[in-house]
C-alpha cells in the first residue's frame, strides 16, 4: 500500500493558519499588546454578539527604551538668562537670540560677557541647592514613627522652597535691571546687590561695552562722568558769597564823608506881642 498524504480542506487550512498566527502573537517579542486585556475585550464582545475588528499599529520606538529614558535636566541656564534679556532689547535688524548666543560664545574677547551670565546662573543654582539639601537632611533625621512631625517638616520644606524660588526670581530681576541700565547708559549703576568680589561695577561696564562694539557693532559713547562737588572752606565761602558789585558799593559807602548838619536854634526873639 502507498501512503497518500491526507489533503486538508480549505476550512481546516484556514483554522491552522489562524492558530499559528495567534501563537505567534502570544510568543512574539515584538508584540507590545496587553494580551490579557485584549482577551477580556474579545470575550465581552463575543458574549454581546458585537462585531469587532482588530487593528495593528506599529510602535515607532521601543517601549523599554522609553521607560528607561530619564528626563534631561538642564543645569546650564546661561542661555536662558541671555535669551530673557536679549529679546527685550533686540532690534529688528539684529540677529536672533540663538545666533547671537553662538556668536558671543565663539568670540574670545566676549568671554567676560559670557562669564556674567555664568556667574549669575551659579548664584541662582546655589539658592536652589541650599533649600534642597536642607530639606533632605531634615527628612533623613525624622524617625519613621513620627508621621505628624513629618507632615509639619514637609510643609516647612515647601515654604523654604517657595522662599528660595522667590529669592532667585528677585536675583534674576535685579540682574536684568542691571544689564538694561548698563546697556542704555554705557556705565553700570553705582550700587547693586549683584556686585561682589568678582562682578564689580567696572567689570560689568567693560563687558557690556565689548558686547556692543564686537557683537552688535554699535558705537559706544564715552560714559558720563558723575559730578562730584569740590569742598569749599568756610572763610573762602564767606568771601565768595558776596557779589563783587555789592562789595564795591559797600566800599564806596564807607569812603564817603557824611555832610555837616546845620543846626537851627529854636529860641525866637520877642516881637511886638502884647503882654
Curated annotation (Swiss-Prot):
Phosphorylated. Transmembrane segments: none annotated. The lineage of its organism: Viruses, Viruses incertae sedis, Naldaviricetes, Lefavirales, Baculoviridae. GO terms for molecular function: DNA binding. It is found in: Host nucleus. This is Protein pp31. GO terms for cellular component: host cell nucleus; virogenic stroma. Residues 68-72 are annotated as: Nuclear localization signal. Plays a role in both early and late gene expression. Keywords: DNA-binding, Early protein, Host nucleus, Phosphoprotein. The keyword DNA-binding applies. The keyword Phosphoprotein applies. It comes from Autographa californica nuclear polyhedrosis virus (AcMNPV). Residues 227-275 are annotated as: Disordered. Residues 265-275 have a biased composition (Polar residues).
Amino acid at each position: 500500500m502507498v501512503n497518500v498524504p491526507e489533503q486538508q480542506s480549505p476550512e481546516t487550512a484556514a483554522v491552522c493558519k489562524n492558530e499559528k498566527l495567534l501563537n505567534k502573537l502570544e510568543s512574539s517579542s515584538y508584540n507590545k499588546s496587553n494580551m490579557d486585556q485584549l482577551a477580556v475585550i474579545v470575550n465581552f464582545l463575543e458574549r454581546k454578539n458585537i462585531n469587532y475588528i482588530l487593528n495593528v499599529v506599529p510602535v515607532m520606538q521601543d517601549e523599554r527604551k522609553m521607560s528607561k529614558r530619564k528626563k534631561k535636566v538642564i543645569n546650564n541656564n546661561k542661555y536662558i538668562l541671555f535669551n530673557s534679556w536679549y529679546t527685550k532689547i533686540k532690534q529688528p535688524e539684529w540677529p536672533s537670540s540663538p545666533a547671537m548666543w553662538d556668536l558671543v560664545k565663539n568670540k574670545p574677547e566676549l568671554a567676560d560677557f559670557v562669564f556674567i551670565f555664568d556667574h549669575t546662573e551659579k548664584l541662582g543654582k546655589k539658592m536652589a541647592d541650599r533649600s534642597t539639601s536642607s530639606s533632605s537632611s531634615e527628612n533623613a533625621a525624622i524617625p519613621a514613627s513620627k508621621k505628624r512631625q513629618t507632615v509639619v517638616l514637609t510643609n516647612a520644606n515647601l515654604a523654604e522652597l517657595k522662599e528660595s524660588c522667590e529669592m532667585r526670581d528677585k536675583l534674576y530681576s535685579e540682574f536684568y535691571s542691571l544689564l538694561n541700565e548698563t546697556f542704555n547708559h554705557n556705565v553700570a549703576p553705582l550700587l547693586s546687590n549683584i556686585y561682589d568680589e568678582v562682578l564689580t561695577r567696572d567689570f560689568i561696564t567693560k563687558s557690556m561695552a565689548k558686547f556692543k562694539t564686537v557683537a552688535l557693532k554699535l558705537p559706544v559713547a564715552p560714559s558720563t562722568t558723575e559730578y562730584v562737588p569740590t569742598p569749599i572752606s568756610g572763610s573762602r565761602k564767606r568771601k565768595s558769597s558776596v557779589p563783587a558789585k555789592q562789595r564795591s558799593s559797600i566800599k564806596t559807602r564807607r569812603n564817603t564823608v557824611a555832610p555837616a548838619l546845620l543846626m537851627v536854634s529854636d529860641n525866637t526873639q520877642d516881637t511886638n506881642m502884647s503882654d
